[in-house]
Regions:
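Mature catalytic core of soluble alpha/beta enzymes
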Residues: 1-147
Length: 147
């Protein structure tokens, strides 16, 4: 297991359980937003919780939509699982910028990619390949996902 600033790469051995931070409660020792079992591959998450952009009294996400130049507001957090950590890192930014429906379609159409999103209203959304916590084969969707 390699942890590079929160982006993970896991190769071989037993699957690990990863708790995904809830950006609405970015504190130590609070329950995670969700959990996922990572068997082999990379995992990356992105949210505005740890690196907000402050302009005067306003607080924005540090993730900017390259199409508009403005901070993303519709997605509070994005997490992806991919074959490696670098791909997961890039894919997390992509799905975090896209609208939720577009992000899920992108993940479903991309081999080896799965994503989990928290939208601005608190809804959780998962792509088809997002593994359910406790299912080592990753064959089932999370019970808590809404789509």
């Amino acid at each position: 297991l390699v942890n590079a600033g929160g982006d993970l790469l896991h190769r071989g051995g037993e699957p690990i359980t990863v708790g995904i931070e809830d950006p609405r409660r970015p504190f130590d020792n609070v329950p995670p937003l969700t959990r996922v079992t990572l068997a082999d591959g990379g995992l990356a998450s992105s949210s505005g919780a740890r690196r907000p952009l402050r302009v005067g009294t306003a607080v924005f996400s540090h993730v900017l939509d390259p199409r508009t130049g403005w901070p993303v507001e519709h997605t509070l957090a994005a997490t992806t699982i991919a074959p490696d950590a670098a791909t997961a890192d890039v894919a997390t930014t992509v799905v975090g910028v896209l609208a939720v429906g577009e992000a899920l379609a992108f993940a479903d159409a991309t081999d080896g990619l799965a994503c989990h999103l928290l939208d601005c209203c608190g809804g959780q959304h998962s792509s088809r390949r997002w593994p359910r916590f406790g299912a080592p084969d990753g064959s089932e969707r999370p019970q808590a996902s809404a789509r």
